[in-house]
Amino acid sequence: MAFKLVDKVLSFMGFEEEVVEEEEKRARDEIVEEQPWQRKKEKDRGAVLSLHAQRQVRVVVVEPRAFDEVQGIADNLKNRRPVIVNLEQAEPDLAKRIVDFISGATYALNGSLQKVGSGIFLFVPNNMDIASDLKDPQKEKGIFTWMRS
């Protein structure tokens, strides 16, 4: 009877719950120890990152025929894809508008551009650099000399 009185007092003070929690914790620890070592290894393997994995870069090549296509080109730059724009077949006024728009989008995205050839431009987002041995188009007589024919 005295034992039940002590249990009631301990229960009233909240000590009985701690004993139950400790027993449950021990039971959980025993269950974890009983699990095979392979499961722990599989869990740990998920947190490992390969530092040498490289993401493939897709270069988009476009030959716009209308000014309506420039938004799609700018969207590719926003998605961090380099874009080669071929304007050799475009009318000079349309080509100028397209280059102006895409140049502005490239500048806004902190990207860069390079004239590759007559009417061909390379626009890259800010996560890429252009390494080139080509002459700088600004060093020529005009920035868009290909349009003066």
Swiss-Prot record:
GTP-binding keyword on record: no
Predominant place of localization: cytoplasm
Pfam families on file: SepF
UniProt-listed InterPro entries: Cell_div_SepF, Cell_div_SepF/SepF-rel, SepF-like_sf
Signal peptide: none
Domain of life, source organism: Bacteria
BP terms from Gene Ontology: division septum assembly; FtsZ-dependent cytokinesis
Subunit structure: Homodimer. Interacts with FtsZ.
Family according to the record: Belongs to the SepF family.
UniProt name for this protein: Cell division protein SepF
Lineage of the organism: Bacteria, Bacillati, Bacillota, Clostridia, Eubacteriales
